[in-house]
Amino acid sequence: MSPSPTRLTVRSVDPLKTPNLTSRAPVRPSRKSKWAETTAHLQRKPCHSRSNSPAWEISGPPWSSLDHLDPIRHQSLQPSDFGARTPTGAHPGLGAYSPPPEEAMPFEFNEPAQEDRCQPPLQVPDLAPGGPEAWVSRALPAEPGNLGFENTGFREDYSPPPEESVPFQLDGEEFGGDSPPPDSASHATNRHWRFEFPTVAVPSTLCLRPARTRLPSGSRAPLADHARLSDLLTSHTTFPQWRSPDPCLRLAEPPLGSTTTPLSIWTAPQSQVMARPSKSREPQLRASTQRDPHLSDKQPRQETALSAAPLQRRQKSPPSSEEKDPPPNLKQCISSQLLLRSPERTLPKPIRTQLHTQFFRSVLRKSEESQPCPPIFRLLLKMRAQMSGQNQTEGQPQPPLPSPKTTENQPPPPPPSQPPSQPLSQPPSQPPSQPPSQLPRQSLTPKPSLPPGQSPTPKRSPQPRQPLPRRRSLPPGQPPSPLRSPLPGLSLLPEPIQPPGLSLEPQRCQPLLGQPPLEQPMQVLWSGEPGHSRLLQPLGHPSLPAQQLPPEQPLLPAQSLPAGQPLPPQAGPILDPPARRSRLLTRLLRGLLRGRVPGLTNTNVAEAAAGMRLRPASARSSPPAMSRKKGPLAASSGFCGETAALASPGATQSGATRSATSSPEPSEAASVYLSVPDHDPSAPGRPRILWKRGANRCAKKPWRCESRSAQIRNAASSSTSNWRRRRWTTCVHTACCF
């Protein structure tokens, strides 16, 4: 690859070697040359890959070789013009080689002196197409000593500009207008270097105009082309306007290399009109109107205007086809109604109600005679008649229709021609934000305004209803209570199954609907226990009425019996606070997997379910021989022990009461944990954890000898265990719970 035009080098050239424009290294080792020559390695063919680059557009077209010149310029470069020739027509010193016309131009600085003649200089100011004319002078001076700077290599009618005459630098010296005077030391140095010419220094034989990106000789300011090229390569405006698809990145900082827009202006909210639409699929943050400060200021005004617009539409809306103007007789009756306003305030309410009813009936008759009455007045008349008849039968005072405020400047009330969507009985002072479900819709008569000192009278419903008791606010996880029964203290429905967030046990202090809340827990008796037909009295409420149940009527689980008689000491247990259902279910499954649920021999499914729902505090509290994670060492769990105690007829009532009520007093029944073990209770249980023996004995680290599945398999294969029966019982308990 040939060097670019801007990388012209100065090196010595062997005069005996054939000039090759493309070779860099010599073919054979040449002798050391006496002359330092300048050689410009020109391009044979232009590089097409560089012709499209912006650098070539600024600096001009690529340099061309001599074969690109015009025919007129070729005529001035004939071989006969370059000094003496040998008889064969070749240059002296080139041997028998005769170069072609395009290579006949010598690129050496000058040839060796032949007799008294010298090689005429060759001047090519610019080889680029469209540049100054390239020519070779044919005039030879008479003597070599008379060579002058003014006539060397120049035509008589042409004077090149100073920047085109001597563009190159040889040995650090510059030729041209800024060259030193002939008497200076540098000029003497050049004279010694140019020992061939005892006269002045001659400029280069081949003068080429440099590239436009090269700085001129002796000038420190860059050319306009050079500045334009540097701007083209370094300016951020030529970069493609890349935009990140992420709107967060576009709002975070300006583009890379941007120096025009500061960060504060870039991150400022821009209006939707000024923002450039993006083609990305992600939501655009600039498209929202909330980022525009001008639009955000106008938003509350728009909201108020929108809220006020429906009211204006309702006031300005024309009447519908059904709600035409009332007949003239009706207008007269309405105007005559104003006469009844003054005595209304002095008359009692029943009389006022009768007057209103008679008035509307008369209006209806007169309007039917002249014109059919609108359906709104018929409905109004029926409602008023029902209200007046009910008030007379019940003897309750009926509130009158509020009369409008009578003032001198106030016009008569408008006729009932408003849209049916807006209730006419709505007072003007009522805020429009009140939900429509709370608006009274009983009467459709125009409700006039009240005087300043009078409070509005609440209207009653058309049909009297019994007042329903207000619902009590229950805690977040508590289900609603069952429906109230006709009997004041008895609930006919069993307690519903509670959601998974709660326990399966009955609530301790959950009174029925309509009963006062109990300060203390209520005592409950379960079916199957002695004394279940006795009366129970809630503690702290001796004044509640007693209700006797027949002995043959079974008592459902979780059913309370308030009673008026004192309770004997051997009554049923007191319920404890409920446990979480998740914990109870976990223990059920754990006992099912371990096979430690004892079977029930003489119990049915209902009693088993009743026993499952009871879980005293003694069952939740771990006995001394119970592991924290793996339950008691005996083959029973707490809730199953209580089930066995309730099912076995031999268990003492006092022991069951004490164990169920978590009595701190020691008892024999509590010490044996109220369970019927299948194996010998005196036999020590097999330890589950064996201590390591050896050097690590002092560390007291537990080491399990076998897995849990092996223990279950061994327990099932033992002769003294009823593991399958206990597992079936546990499945029955679990099914009853759900």
UniProtKB/Swiss-Prot annotation:
GO terms for biological process: adenylate cyclase-activating adrenergic receptor signaling pathway; adenylate cyclase-activating dopamine receptor signaling pathway; adenylate cyclase-activating G protein-coupled receptor signaling pathway; adenylate cyclase-activating serotonin receptor signaling pathway; bone development; cartilage development; cellular response to glucagon stimulus; cognition. Residues 279-301 have a biased composition (Basic and acidic residues). GO terms for cellular component: COPI-coated Golgi to ER transport vesicle; cytoplasm; cytosol; dendrite; endosome; heterotrimeric G-protein complex; membrane; neuronal cell body. GO terms for molecular function: adenylate cyclase activator activity; adenylate cyclase regulator activity; alpha-tubulin binding; beta-2 adrenergic receptor binding; corticotropin-releasing hormone receptor 1 binding; D1 dopamine receptor binding; G protein activity; G-protein alpha-subunit binding. It comes from the Eukaryota. Residues 1-105, 155-188, 237-350, 387-516, 528-578, 611-689 are annotated as: Disordered. Residues 410-438, 448-467, 476-485 have a biased composition (Pro residues). This is Protein ALEX. It comes from Rattus norvegicus. The gene is Gnas.
